[in-house]
Amino acid sequence: MARIAGIDLPRDKRIAIALTYIFGIGRPTADKILAETGINPDTRTRDLTDEEVARLREYIDKNVEVEGDLRREISLNIKRLMEIGCYRGLRHRRGLPVRGQRTKTNARTRKGPARTVAGKKKK
């Protein structure tokens, strides 16, 4: 089983799909990585040679931000927005949608379960 960036890639999937199991690598990035390293995207993970796995590992370590480093960078960006007090930071702090979605109705994922307001009855 190939282990890249601390993730065990599934053996029976094509390498183009298996790379997407790494946080920070989607389909377009996986295709770009395989083109740069010269590996056929249709190859199954179990059929990769040790040399190909080493090439993949080296390329990803040098050129792509993945897993823990990427998660840390994202959380630091959100923390920075909250510290400077910009609108997006305030929305993060209050747990509301950040990208302009409506909140009069919907937005339940961000706001949590509905809290009933006393004195509001439908007639």
From Swiss-Prot:
Molecular function (Gene Ontology), one example: tRNA binding
Name of a matching Pfam family: Ribosomal_S13
InterPro entries membership: Rbsml_uS13_C, Ribosomal_uS13, Ribosomal_uS13-like_H2TH, Ribosomal_uS13_bac-type, Ribosomal_uS13_CS
GO biological process, any: translation
Record keywords: Ribonucleoprotein, Ribosomal protein, RNA-binding, rRNA-binding, tRNA-binding
Span list, region Disordered: 95-123
SUPFAM superfamilies, per database record: S13-like H2TH domain (SSF46946)
Domain of life: Bacteria
GO cellular component: cytosol; small ribosomal subunit
NCBIfam families: uS13_bact (TIGR03631)
Assembly notes: Part of the 30S ribosomal subunit. Forms a loose heterodimer with protein S19. Forms two bridges to the 50S subunit in the 70S ribosome.
Role according to the record: Located at the top of the head of the 30S subunit, it contacts several helices of the 16S rRNA. In the 70S ribosome it contacts the 23S rRNA (bridge B1a) and protein L5 of the 50S subunit (bridge B1b), connecting the 2 subunits; these bridges are implicated in subunit movement. Contacts the tRNAs in the A and P-sites.
Protein family (similarity comment): Belongs to the universal ribosomal protein uS13 family.
Protein's recorded name: Small ribosomal subunit protein uS13
Species name: Heliobacterium modesticaldum (strain ATCC 51547 / Ice1)
